[in-house]
Amino acid sequence: RDREKAIFVDEVWQLIGASSNRLAAEFVLEIAKIIRGYGGSAVFATQDLNDFFALDDGKYGKGIINNCKTKLVLNLEDEEAQRVKQILHLSETEVMNITHFQRGNGLISTNNNNITVEFKASALEKELITTDRQELLEILERHRQKAAG
């Protein structure tokens, strides 16, 4: 308990969704419930809210949401935005914003306080996290040129 810890679970719907099993889902939910007590934090990410709430009528998805103090919402389709509206008690304006967010924009929700944010990455951060194919090819070419001298 004297060391900070963090766990990151990307595509968490695969562990708590309809195609998962209760044992895996229970484990993820337990992490969400107890990790702060051990000086840790957990980050869960998903792009598919329907699957996130699919197992046992959304029991695990709801449990995770309820145990996460801070939620970050990026661009969503209309249907998913309506679901998030109910869960996070968003206004119509916030829902409209969510459906029109561009890359780098999002909504942070904590303690029922919501704020729209714009994320700015440094050149190094962008290079490390981009998934844009064209940007990756440009980065690869720069590294090849640098290595060639």
Model-derived features with residue positions:
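Conserved P-loop NTPase motor module
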Residues: R1, T99-G149
